[in-house]
Amino acid sequence: MKYLIVCVTLALFAYINASPAYGNRGGYGGGYGGGYGPVQRVVYEEVPAYGPSRGYNSYPRSLRSEGNGGSAAAAAAASAAAVNPGTYKQYAIPSYELDGARGYEIGHGYGQRAY
């Protein structure tokens, strides 16, 4: 019984360290690029939608997921996150979103809009 508790504790510790919900800890030091190991993350690529695709009253935007370079670390991170490669739909959720084209957070009433 004592060995069972030790094994379950070690398995839980390994699962928490590998889980993306607590941050992908890559190698020694942890974090994104904070150590000696590889950076593990799942990359999403936005595919433009046809029709009006601006604002909250718009068609959903398609998202395609892929690992970084198809490496084993990215595959393990995607597997742990239960994200399968394919096409995803993103529906509008009221929050702040960063957009590289605009250079500021949506929701702030300043700056020149790019669209």
Curated annotation (Swiss-Prot):
Cellular component annotations (GO), alphabetically ordered: egg chorion; extracellular region
Keywords of this entry: Secreted, Signal
GO MF terms, alphabetically ordered: structural constituent of egg chorion
BP GO terms, sorted: chorion-containing eggshell formation
Signal sequence annotation: 1-18
InterPro entries, alphabetized: Chorion_2 (IPR005649)
Pfam assignment, any one: Chorion_2
Compartment list: Secreted
Domain of life: Eukaryota
Protein family membership: Belongs to the chorion protein S15/S18 family.
Described function: Chorion membrane (egg shell) protein; plays a role in protecting the egg from the environment.
Protein name, per record: Chorion protein S15
